[in-house]
Swiss-Prot record:
This is Ornithine decarboxylase antizyme 1. One of its GO terms (molecular function) is ornithine decarboxylase inhibitor activity. Interacts with ODC1 and thereby sterically blocks ODC homodimerization. Forms a ternary complex with PSMB4 and OAZ1 before PSMB4 is incorporated into the 20S proteasome. Interacts with AZIN2; this interaction disrupts the interaction between the antizyme and ODC1. Interacts with FAM171A1. Ornithine decarboxylase (ODC) antizyme protein that negatively regulates ODC activity and intracellular polyamine biosynthesis and uptake in response to increased intracellular polyamine levels. Binds to ODC monomers, inhibiting the assembly of the functional ODC homodimer, and targets the monomers for ubiquitin-independent proteolytic destruction by the 26S proteasome. Triggers ODC degradation by inducing the exposure of a cryptic proteasome-interacting surface of ODC. Stabilizes AZIN2 by interfering with its ubiquitination. PROSITE patterns: ODC_AZ. GO terms for cellular component: cytoplasm; nucleus. One of its GO terms (biological process) is viral translational frameshifting. It comes from the Eukaryota. Keywords: Polyamine biosynthesis, Transport. Residues 36-50 have a biased composition (Low complexity). It comes from Bos taurus. Belongs to the ODC antizyme family.
């Protein structure tokens, strides 16, 4: 279960390097450098061996494509707040909400892929948003570049709980740029939490030589262990 990992992630030195400076907005977007994942599966079955490709318009050749180089719309923040001056709620549905979390699902034409905007409420005025893609029992989450926003440790812990308890995924994949200054710290921290480095060519991740992927597999209790 992920519970034992959550305490470690709250105390990890990686998430301790949070911003303590100016806060330009009450809503913080946690995808500052890597654009939205757009993930499409090849094959109809949801299994660990299902192959996944992540598409974008920056690569016009065949094979997996991911992360557009062109500007993308800001996150769809409930209530129409944030960096956007327009209310994007018309293209998103409320998926889940509790006292800590508000999750909207973007409407897409692909019924095998689901795109979520996850907003964790740290205080009444402080929110942090993550964008994630759900496909074939896998959740793909981007780790932003630079220092993580203040409160990211609590926000990410809530996101992991949501992935396990509400989405019931088998794996959570994180990705971040290889050339970031704290890459070594991220690798150590997430390895300690149970994440493993995903080698190039893995069927569940796209071909991205500039990105590092790590995977966490949730441990499910069997019926025999529960007795």
């Amino acid at each position: 279960m992920v519970k034992s990992s959550l305490q470690r992630i709250l105390n990890s030195h990686c998430f301790a390097r949070e911003k303590e400076g100016d806060k330009p907005s009450a809503t913080v977007h946690a995808t500052r450098t890597m654009p939205l994942l757009s993930l499409h599966s090849r094959g109809g079955r949801s299994s660990e061996s299902s192959r996944v490709s992540i598409n974008c318009c920056s690569n016009l050749g065949p094979g997996p494509r991911w992360c557009s180089d062109v500007p993308h719309p800001p996150l769809k923040i409930p209530g129409g707040r944030g960096n956007s001056q327009r209310d994007h709620n018309l293209s998103a549905n409320l998926f889940y909400s509790d006292n800590r979390l508000n999750v909207t699902e973007e409407l897409t034409s692909n019924n095998k892929t689901r795109i979520f905007n996850v907003q964790s409420r740290l205080t009444e005025a402080k929110h942090i948003n993550w964008r994630a893609v759900l496909s074939n029992s896998c959740l793909y989450v981007e780790i932003p570049g630079g220092a993580l926003p203040e409160g990211s440790k609590d926000s990410f812990a809530v996101l992991l709980e949501f992935a396990e308890e509400q989405l019931h995924v088998d794996h959570v994949f994180i990705c971040f740029h290889k050339n970031r200054d704290d890459r070594a710290a991220l690798l150590r921290t997430f390895s300690f939490l149970g994440f493993e480095i995903v080698r190039p060519g893995h069927p569940l991740v796209p071909k991205r030589p500039d990105a590092c992927f790590m995977a966490y597999t949730f441990e499910r209790e069997s019926s025999g262990e529960e007795e």
